[in-house]
Structure formats: C-alpha cells, structure tokens
UniProtKB/Swiss-Prot annotation:
It comes from Spinacia oleracea (Spinach). Major role in the synthesis of nucleoside triphosphates other than ATP. The ATP gamma phosphate is transferred to the NDP beta phosphate via a ping-pong mechanism, using a phosphorylated active-site intermediate. Transmembrane segments: none annotated. InterPro entries: NDK-like_dom (IPR034907), NDK-like_dom_sf (IPR036850), Nucleoside_diP_kinase (IPR001564), Nucleoside_diP_kinase_AS (IPR023005). This is Nucleoside diphosphate kinase 2, chloroplastic.
Amino acid sequence: MEAMSGLSSPCNCISSLPHSSSTTTRHQNLLFRRNNHHQQKLAAFHSQSHLFSTKCPLISHSLPRKKSFKPHIFLPHLVASMEQVEETYIMIKPDGVQRGLVGEIISRFEKKGFKLIGLKMYPCPKELAEEHYKDLKAKSFYQKLIDYITSGPVVCMAWEGVGVVASSRKLIGATDPLQAEPGTIRGDLAVQTGRNVVHGSDSPDNGKREIGLWFKEGEICQWTPAQAPWLRE
C-alpha cells in the first residue's frame, strides 16, 4: 500500500527532490525572458479603436497607405466665395432632357436652398455651343462635344445663392460619373463622361459670363423667396 501511495503522488516525489542553485537561477531567468517578451508583444497592440488609426506610432508607419481616388470638387479659387451671394449657370444637357431628368435635377438645387432666377429650354445653336466651349477647342473631343450639345434641346438655368458656384459643383459631382460620389447628380444619374447629364459653371466669373451668354436682357427674374429668412442669418 505504501508503494502504491508513493506511485500515486509523483509530484510529491519530484517536489521533494533537492534543486541546485544554478538550476533555480536558470529557471527564473527563463521565466523572466518569457514574461518580458509577452509584455512587449502586448505593448504593440492598443485598444481596437486605435488599431488602424494613423495616430498610432507603432502601427501607422507599418501599414501601407492606400491612395485616395476621391475627386476634389471644391477648387481653391472657390473657397473664398463660399460666404458670398453669387450666380451660376446650370445646363441640363440633351441626354438629361431625353431621359426625363429635368424635374429631378431642378429639385436638387431647390432643396439645397438656391433661388432659380432664369429658366428656358431650346435647341442649342452650333455657334452658341462653340462659344460656350471655346476653351476646349484644342481638345481632340471638341467636335464630338459640339455635336452632342446640339443634338437636342437643353434646359438653361441661372441660380443664385450663398456660395452657389462651389456648392453646385459639389451637387453635380466629378466630370467622370464613375468617379463621382454617390448622392451627386452625376454619381446617381450618369455612367459615362460623354453623357454626364449636366453642366455647371466652375467659377463666379464664368457663372456671370455664361449667364450673359445664354440669357438675353430681361430674361433674368430677381425675386425674394418666402423661405429666405430660414436659409441665412
């Protein structure tokens, strides 16, 4: 019975064996190194909220930075005009008219809070299209663009509002609809650059020039909407 008792308690036998001081020291050093290595590995990871943050110095430099392909809608020369009342020219192109998008596009500008001060629809004469796009005359696609704009009726609009030029560019989206963000007119309603539905002035100066080009004297209507006090302080 004593022999069986001794066999059933091997741990007691082993623990009773004498340990040399060198063995104990090596064992302690091994435990210390393992614990230190474990702490270093834990220190490399912060809370999950910072795991993929560029503010984390231990991780942000090791992760490859993904290039952003989002189009920059706001041009530098438009930033200073964001608090000024401006006018801009918006044109719904023949494809937008043929697809029945006129109401949809006008609604987006109205919901934004801009004031429609000019509106008409007519077939675009070739001479007018060439004058409008004269800065693109040297481009290889120029003639194709003129043919497209004159292929059917266009809807010409003049809009007024605070920062209307830059905001309109944002509403319209990037020239290439495939790069335009969802929620923009082109991002939602177009798929190809050559059929991108709508045109918008790219600067306050061009807004004035294009309104003067497409509208005759007396065709611009100045009025005060009832909602004006609720749009601006």
